[in-house]
Amino acid sequence: MPRLKLTLEYEGTRYVGWQVQPNGPSIQSVLESGLERLLGARVSVASAGRTDAGVHASGQVACFDSPRVLPMKAYVMGLNGLLPPDVAVVDAVEVAEDFDPRRWSRGKRYRYRVSNRRTRSPLRRMTHWEVFAPLDVEAMRQAAAHLLGRHDFSAFRAADCQAKHAVREIRSLAVEGTSGDAVSFVVEGTAFLKHMVRNLAGTLVEVGKGRRPASWVAEVLASQERKRAGPTAPPQGLVLEEVFYRDGPPARTPGGTTDAEEDEG
């Protein structure tokens, strides 16, 4: 039974998130339903990350064991013909039988988008956080520099985050765009805590609005207290852009876990 790795793109507005839940449609549920129709049997799908309600993806990764052997094109084109228009398979490849989309990950890249023009945008309302005030891009870049590296990000985790610890590594955090139009925070890290990127975005916007100096972000990080950071940015601005992989499962220290196994992003 071959194991297939799917790369997915979806517009998450009408979904309760990745994971199957009783209160509405999820990305996982519509994907598993489409696969059942395509393959004639029920399959279970695992993902690289559990995106929240309203969050989008251009590079989510999922995998499943296929009860039938089909050409790769059939998995892509056939499944896309069965999925709703806001979910699509971009690519399908066969992988090792022990491939795990979360555990084998060596990192992810997210983009958080903010519309900072003074008037609302009908075209951005489902894909950006609209703040209606020009943001200081340079100040936010200075603030973002304090977040690079490996730190305890307790100040940026959700209250109900289940991760055993809050130590994570941010490899890069770029602030792109233009004051008075649209700005993006592009963050790449080994793993993420629940709501971590949205909390980082909310904190950087506080600096961009001039409410706090760039140095305040370093103080928030050192405090390890969620109440010291900015608000949680809304979900519609967040996109999971890419999941990065190694050639095989990551090495583990005796009795320890890898960053990927602790990932809640």
Swiss-Prot record:
Descriptive protein name: tRNA pseudouridine synthase A
NCBIfam families linked to this entry: hisT_truA
**What does the record give under GO molecular function?**
RNA binding; tRNA pseudouridine(38-40) synthase activity
User: Which SUPFAM superfamilies does this UniProt record tie to the protein?
Assistant: Pseudouridine synthase
Residues annotated as region Disordered?
244-265
Family indicated by similarity:
Belongs to the tRNA pseudouridine synthase TruA family.
Q: Subunit arrangement?
A: Homodimer.
Instruction: Write out the GO biological process terms.
Output: tRNA pseudouridine synthesis
Primary role: Formation of pseudouridine at positions 38, 39 and 40 in the anticodon stem and loop of transfer RNAs.
Tell me yes or no: is tRNA processing among this UniProt entry's keywords: yes
Which Gene3D superfamilies did the record assign?
Pseudouridine synthase I, catalytic domain, C-terminal subdomain, Pseudouridine synthase I, catalytic domain, N-terminal subdomain
* Highest taxon of the lineage: Bacteria
**What keywords sit in the KW lines?**
Isomerase, tRNA processing
EC code(s) of this entry: 5.4.99.12
Amino-acid positions noted as binding substrate in the UniProt annotation, renumbered to this chain: Y110
Q: Which gene codes for it?
A: truA
Please name the InterPro entries in this protein's record: PsdUridine_synth_cat_dom_sf, PsdUridine_synth_TruA, PsdUridine_synth_TruA_a/b_dom, PsdUridine_synth_TruA_C, TruA/RsuA/RluB/E/F_N
Reactions the enzyme catalyzes: uridine(38/39/40) in tRNA = pseudouridine(38/39/40) in tRNA
Which Pfam family is one of this chain's hits? PseudoU_synth_1
